């Protein structure tokens, strides 16, 4: 053994080829400080051994290296620029040391080689991948750029155009696609991986392969003619900005760094990367996006833990077919859990099956599935008009019409047909789980399971704990949601649960603006373009449905009369009473037609403006800051109330609920990250300016205390 540490082992194989194996104690390899220090020490040991003629990098795991240890980032990025620069330079010295070894090097890549893992393989002369390999630099998705030489080496390996696409999108690439652009030199079967890498090194040692010429290309400036370079980078800037937009600076910074470094050798090029990396690491966007990544890990960790308490779900059922039932059935079956779809009407079952088939056909058309897989998934969906089909179901999801009496009746009925230990969950967006539980003989085996529409696209599922729900029930439904490929957050029962409870104060703020003559299209534009929502409030209400919004608003007003009670007609009422229900009937705030691709296309409609003018008078212009404050303050305060009341367990889960359930702008990180970035004291001062607008604008006592103490919701 040439070198050994808890994360890396180096041994000498036949023909004096050294093998460096990444072998961290956990399930995956990642570059934390310890692994980086071990790699540095291992390379020193390798350099000192005069017998070594070549080096192969391998992994003992199913993956190569998944990237840097992101849990270290926020603390590290909070350091002074000089400290951060020192860390980046020390880390890069390790990768330079690998690249500068006096003999040929190769990486044997399986599974993920992402971020720092990808930058490791770029520092070797040859790269062999097996068919499971996925390679990429996802840093721009975290608001930063590669910091271990990725922007320098990748363009010199695969060309500037390809590198610009890889780095600016942050997407990982399959082995076959990496081979096409020259990121890897060969793709082999998993069992042949190490042998193929060693054979390539033997050929390099025997001078059949010119490893030094390859290395020199990475150390030199890019060989791009001036005119071609100018055209390439100008085109890239336009394309990248069109996708990334003004709120996500990292992709554009990556283009700029690659352009500036294109005429430099390695040392100068790395300095350009270092400076841009440090600048981006200090941004609020990086803090927000890294925070989302860490929050996602926390939520998934909780779900994994729940799996240990959970009853295994081998068979499921959904009550109520149609679009929602079909979506739930598709999601369950496509992730491997057979499901019975029960309804009282054959046309509803046909609609549900058609919905599942339509979603599967789209997967096949996009090349993400095959007709064989589609048939297998459809065979996992069993339509039935009879409750008897549910007798083997471990979990039954009730998804009938959103009416308390009908739901209660169906829940009471189904309890008589399922097994003693079956779990029943209600897919409801507003109806109290405690209320529905009153109709059940075993309320401990009942909870809420709120899917968001469309089911196949929306990642969030709210699992609602009723006062009688057992821990096993909650754990089992959380585990089932995870198995379906969803991100579950557990919330306690209250009107609207978590997501709808915080959404409707936002709509109330919007209604307030319209009642004073606000222009809904202008408000949408501000909330989309400036704040960053995927849809403004008027457009979102049209998509949700004004009938659904009208009903949910009434539920919220009844549940929280002090803050959400209504004294008169608002804009939602106006649209609903005039049968303008949104996209579902082609007219709401906007009017809808179908474009050439069959998608709804919205246009401003003078009729809706006329109705609002009749109700609220002439249009009035509001400043953008005023629009943002009046819509967002109620949502933010209500979110804080949910945390204080224990409806949601942590700031992390609340923020993930907002990002995944409502499309809260990821670059802002969620309400609690937004509050911390703004400063709680600054927010309280802003809210106080609008306190005269009513209860939704009144901050809590705990918020005032936190503001006075200069506190934050996340620990630095």
UniProtKB/Swiss-Prot annotation:
EC number: 4.2.1.17, 5.1.2.3, 5.3.3.8, 1.1.1.35
Catalytic center residues: 450
Record site: Important for catalytic activity: 119, 139
UniProt xrefs under NCBIfam families: FadB (TIGR02437), PRK11730.1 (NF008727)
Family (UniProt): In the N-terminal section; belongs to the enoyl-CoA hydratase/isomerase family.
GO biological process: fatty acid beta-oxidation
Protein function: Involved in the aerobic and anaerobic degradation of long-chain fatty acids via beta-oxidation cycle. Catalyzes the formation of 3-oxoacyl-CoA from enoyl-CoA via L-3-hydroxyacyl-CoA. It can also use D-3-hydroxyacyl-CoA and cis-3-enoyl-CoA as substrate.
Keywords assigned by UniProt, alphabetized: Fatty acid metabolism, Isomerase, Lipid degradation, Lipid metabolism, Lyase, Multifunctional enzyme, NAD, Oxidoreductase
CDD domains the UniProt entry points to: crotonase-like
PANTHER family found in the cross-reference section: TRIFUNCTIONAL ENZYME SUBUNIT ALPHA, TRIFUNCTIONAL ENZYME SUBUNIT ALPHA, MITOCHONDRIAL
HAMAP family linked: FadB (MF_01621)
InterPro entries: 3-OHacyl-CoA_DH_CS, 3-OHacyl-CoA_DH_NAD-bd, 3HC_DH_C, 6-PGluconate_DH-like_C_sf, ClpP/crotonase-like_dom_sf, Enoyl-CoA_hydra/iso, FA_oxidation_alpha_subunit, FadB
SUPFAM superfamilies per the UniProt record, alphabetical: 6-phosphogluconate dehydrogenase C-terminal domain-like (SSF48179), ClpP/crotonase (SSF52096), NAD(P)-binding Rossmann-fold domains (SSF51735)
Protein name: Fatty acid oxidation complex subunit alpha
Gene Ontology MF annotations: 3-hydroxybutyryl-CoA epimerase activity; delta(3)-delta(2)-enoyl-CoA isomerase activity; enoyl-CoA hydratase activity; long-chain-3-hydroxyacyl-CoA dehydrogenase activity; NAD+ binding
